Amino acid sequence: MNKLQSYFIASVLYVMTPHAFAQGTVTIYLPGEQQTLSVGPVENVVQLVTQPQLRDRLWWPGALLTDSAAKAKALKDYQHVMAQLASWEAEADDDVAATIKSVRQQLLNLNITGRLPVKLDPDFVRVDENSNPPLVGDYTLYTVQRPVTITLLGAVSGAGQLPWQAGRSVTDYLQDHPRLAGADKNNVMVITPEGETVVAPVALWNKRHVEPPPGSQLWLGFSAHVLPEKYADLNDQIVSVLTQRVPD
């Protein structure tokens, strides 16, 4: 075999390697638009977030990237949470059962899709090689415009969307929203639009000024004193589910 034949065979083998086919296609839901946008092939996250057609059309901190495997797992986790809430409600005392029912109703119609653990900040991923994973296969990107609300959820009255205001703390948002029976009196979990979680201490003895960014979810969970042992990690499970929802 001469050198030319060897070079040709080597070139063909390289093209046929998995690396050569390591590309993804992304279906994008843009805010306020009826039709989706398809982007691809893209090799990695940087190629996705720097697409010219996406510039100024979305708010990257609120974007969520998912695939079929992540969605399937998130839906399974969500169904498990809802089943546990229903079982606990049937066993609980009347006042706590009413709180559990309220929480179940709040979570009933969530649009759960899963979230891949990737950063989507264009400025960040372009300079951090470790935050630029390859994209292989089919993905979905959900996006939003910059929000003007936060969402209050959990064992609290008046749950729902509240106007976001710069400088307001989690404690400020809880004003005029009394806790329900069995609520945690010490901490609130802040779920940022990026899916990150921050504990906000809100009791007199541990209060700390925590300002949630726009688009955050504030989860006021169940007190550890009312959670049965078999549901001891239910708050954590619910928070995990809330990080997997399609952004509003």
From Swiss-Prot:
UniProtKB keywords: Signal
Protein name: Uncharacterized protein GfcC
Organism per entry: Escherichia coli (strain K12)
Signal peptide: 1-22
Family indicated by similarity: To E.coli YjbG.
Source organism, top-level taxon: Bacteria
InterPro entries found in the cross-reference section: Caps_syn_GfcC_N (IPR046459), Caps_synth_GfcC-like_C (IPR010425)
